[in-house]
């Protein structure tokens, strides 16, 4: 029995929750969306919870607070018993951990991850994120944040989970990784 602010959830209500985690640029969202589609599970992306996309010119404007995100995440989990959740870490308190039946930890070399993050930014914002662009400073601060994250941060966090941890190589094709995950969760 798990009580979260007068919202009682019992194990009988739990379906299958899978957290896909890894550092920025590891391919969490891409893999998570594809995995959710393959399993016919609900997809929850931490980035979507944090950023309500109220400003069409800059999707990262007006981020929600961690408390708001936690409340939204609980709402999503209650509404969808089978889900794939993507996040760098799912560290929203130990009360959520029992809802993860599997954790998928994506590993990608740092240089590849950092390049992916820059490429993604350019795909979203184009010249606006380049020198002289109106988003240059904001995006550079984000890149510095991504670079500053300890390489072992997610590995250390995932050790606190009680579910099986599936480690995958995020440089491999998405379909290959999905096939591996499917084999592991069906056994």
Annotate each PLM feature:
Residues 23:
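P-loop (Walker A) phosphate-binding loop of NTP-binding proteins
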Residues 26:
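ATP-binding Walker
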Residues 29:
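Walker A/P-loop
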